[in-house]
Each structure stands twice: as C-alpha cells, then as structure tokens.
C-alpha cells in the first residue's frame, strides 16, 4: 500500500491552516511514519505535483490522501478522520 498526502501551498507561499492542523495530528499520532509521500499543491503553479493529482482525482480541497494498492482503484480521502478510521486504525 502507498499513501500520498497532498498539502496546499497558498499563493503567498504559506501552508493552508487545515494542512498545518492535519500535519500536527499525523505527527502527534505517529501516523506520519506511514505516509509514503507528501506533495504540494501550489496555488501559483497549476503544474505542481499536488495540483496534477487534484485534477486527476477530481479533488478541489486540501489536504487530501490517496491510498493505492496493487490491482485496486485508488481511494481518496478529503476528511482526515475518515482516512484515519478506514486506513490507519483497522
């Protein structure tokens, strides 16, 4: 399983407030160690890796998680607690 976290970078270069909050929760819980990749969706760069992933998965908010397993469709989570409940805790 591969887990990707997409964080938003605002036009002024700062991280979005919700992204900072989710990163704190991931670090505090220890779940950050299970995240394989963290990419940025830069508002100033529509070709940034995170913006491309957002378009590919039809997501219009950040942060979001993409969970990939071989032979299965990707699962996308835009709600932190749902992601934790369904992917981290089972």
Question: Model-predicted segments: where are they?
Answer:
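Local sequence-structure signature of Cys/Sec-based thiol-disulfide redox active-site neighborhoods
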Residues: 1-37
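Acidic, low-complexity intrinsically disordered segments
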Residues: 62-66
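Generic alpha-helical propensity signal that fires on short helical segments
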Residues: 21-23, 53-56, 77
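Broad hydrophobic/π-residue packing in well-ordered secondary structure
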Residues: 6, 57, 78-80
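General "foldedness" signal
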Residues: 17-19, 40, 52, 68, ...
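Generic hydrophobic, helix-prone segments enriched in Leu/Val/Ile
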Residues: 34-35, 52, 84
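Thioredoxin-like thiol-disulfide oxidoreductase module
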Residues: 39-61, 88-90
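Non-catalytic, surface beta->alpha helical segment in thiol-disulfide oxidoreductase systems
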Residues: 67-90
């Amino acid at each position: 399983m591969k887990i990707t976290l997409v964080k938003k970078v605002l036009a002024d270069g700062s991280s979005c407030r919700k992204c900072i909050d989710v990163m704190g929760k991931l670090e505090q819980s220890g779940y950050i160690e299970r995240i394989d990749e963290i990419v940025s969706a830069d508002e100033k760069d529509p070709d940034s890796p995170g913006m491309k992933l957002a378009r590919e998965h039809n997501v219009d908010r950040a942060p979001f998680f993409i969970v990939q397993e071989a032979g299965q469709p990707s699962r996308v989570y835009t709600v932190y607690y749902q992601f934790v409940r369904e992917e981290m805790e089972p």
